[in-house]
From Swiss-Prot:
Pfam families: Ribosomal_S6 (PF01250)
Cellular component annotations (GO), alphabetically ordered: cytoplasm; ribonucleoprotein complex; ribosome
Keyword DNA-binding attributed: no
UniProt-recorded Gene Ontology molecular function terms: small ribosomal subunit rRNA binding; structural constituent of ribosome
GO terms, biological process: translation
This protein's record includes keyword Zinc-finger: no
Lineage top rank: taxon: Bacteria
Organism of this sequence: Corynebacterium efficiens (strain DSM 44549 / YS-314 / AJ 12310 / JCM 11189 / NBRC 100395)
Annotated gene: rpsF
Record-given protein name: Small ribosomal subunit protein bS6
Family assignment from sequence similarity: Belongs to the bacterial ribosomal protein bS6 family.
Cited function: Binds together with bS18 to 16S ribosomal RNA.
Amino acid sequence: MRQYELMIILDPSQDERTVAPSLDKFLEVVRKDKGDVVKVDVWGKRRLAYPINKKEEGIYAVIDLKCESATVLELDRVLNLNDGVLRTKVLRLDK
């Protein structure tokens, strides 16, 4: 298994109290494939450097994962299908 860092920018119209449950729903993909969610860090609402989908702000979350590469591809696919997710970025961490 490899370590990954996933940054997600969510739609700012979401209530910040509902961010953690919605992230949990996405992370079920990782847990289902016997991966491990090491850390979830929600940064909260921040101003974007440039507008994304006509939004000036976004709710940032950084997640550390330990899983297989196929699981990360599936997670990225699921996130991109959701309208509440503005942008994602997955980085593979060095050992």
